[in-house]
Structure formats: C-alpha cells, structure tokens
Amino acid sequence: MKLPKGTRSSVYFAQHPEKEPLPSRQEVKQTPVIMAKIKGPGPAKYLRPSCTGYIDHDISMFKAPAYTLHSRHSEKRMVCHSSPGPCYLLDPKITRFGMSSCPQVPMEERISNLRLNPTLASCQYYFEKIHPPGERRAPQYTFGYRRPYRVMDLNPAPNQYQMPLLLGPNTPVSRAAPCYSLASRDKNWFYKEDVAGGPGPTTYARPEPSIYQNRSPTYSMAKRFAYPLDLTPRPGPGSHEVQQVTVHKPHIPAFTMGIKHSLHLCPLVIDIRD
C-alpha cells in the first residue's frame, strides 16, 4: 500500500510500521552466557522438605507413625507444679439430682448402766499390805537415782583452782626470805654496753648554726636561660627523593603489573544467614 507524499513520516493506527530486517547469522556476535551475571537464587536456595520426623515432612513421601518418649517424672517435678492439685474434693454422693446414698445406721459402743453403785466390794481390799495402826514400825526410806548435772552449768570444778606456792619470794599469804639472782659470767662490761639504758650524746643530730646564731643572707643560683629557637620539624636534605621527581624531567612510561581480577569471583562466605 502506497502512502501519500506528504504523509510518509506519519503512522496510521490501522497499519503496522515496517520492521527492519534482522542481520544474517554471520553478523550476530555470539557471546557466552555467564551465570554469575544472572541475578537470582541458586539451586541450593530451595531445599527439599525433610523425609525424617513429622515436622515439615515431605507430602510426597510415606510418613510412619511418630511417638514421643518423655523422661520419667520425678518427685521434684510434682512438687514444683504450681497448680492446686486435687484439693477440691467433691462428694461422690452428690449428683445433679441431689443426695444419692443408701440408708446408714451409726454403730457406737454400749453405754454403761448409770444405776450401778461404784462402791468397792469387800474382796477388793488387801489387809495384808496394811500395817496395824497401833504397832511400832521401822522408818522407811526411798532411794531414787542420782540427778545428772546440768549441761549448761559452766561453773569450774574445785580441781580447776590452784593453791598459791609457798616457795620463793612470790608468796601472797606467808612471809618470804630475801631472794637473790646470780647471772652468768659471759657478759663483759665494755664501753659499748648500755648500762644506763638511755640514748647517748651521738644519738641527737647537731642543729644548724643559723638556728641559734645570726643567719647570713642566702642566694639561689639558677641556670642560664636559652635563646628562643624555632623547634618546628622541617625536612632535611636527605628527606627528599630526587630520583622520583618527574615533574620537570622526561621519563620513560611506567606500567603497573597487577593480578587479573574477575568480576564473577565467588567471595569467601563465612557467616550464612537465612
């Protein structure tokens, strides 16, 4: 279908624009498919459901009956239980229709006859055990067991006290003769022996003469002040590397040889978080 001359650039809704012809098979550049460029979860992301146990079991697999084995309950577990337990005992005789029980008769002991006289008979008296009231008899005594000492009685016994000695000068109740002490001869009375028992004249330090005499003037000698210097750290002649200066001098081209890195290198994954 030919279009008018003035409307070659316009497109009608009733027709489709002409498609450009595709290049031949020789002109299409074949590039290998790199799986690392495909952004999506890998095959290990989707796991199959487990075939063991009863939680999240695979529905396509047969599942055997599962039983739970619990440990034996101890007395401590029953004691630590916070529920009130069977303290609310309901009477089994009470039903929703009321009391339901058979006739009951209480059985008690036989009551003694209150009309009988409790006076003792003549056969219940023992005359052989009674001494004649008009005759003399020897005194009778009762021997009981010895009372034990009190455990909390902490008083010392008589053998815990010692009598004072009667020998020597330390007698508080008797008169003692004079007592002398004899020392050994291995003690030499030299000039170094402290007989008086007090400090010597060399023990005390001699005071300064300025304390008890007229004090002369004193002066303090200080060090000489240094000239002000600029201590700012500055580089010396050996700090500059002249061989590396290439700003104003010609130099040969330099290349950096490194390692070829791949954009699709698998990184080291240490912590896996689902």
Curated annotation (Swiss-Prot):
Positions with biased composition (Basic and acidic residues): 16-27
Lineage of origin: Eukaryota, Metazoa, Chordata, Craniata, Vertebrata
Pfam family, one: SHIPPO-rpt
Keywords: Repeat
Chain ranges passing through the membrane: none
Gene Ontology CC annotations of this record: cytoskeleton
InterPro entries: CIMAP (IPR051291), SHIPPO-rpt (IPR010736)
Chain residue ranges for the region called Disordered: 1-27
STPGR repeats mapped onto the chain: 199-224, 235-260
Family under the similarity heading: Belongs to the CIMAP family.
Protein name: Protein CIMAP1C
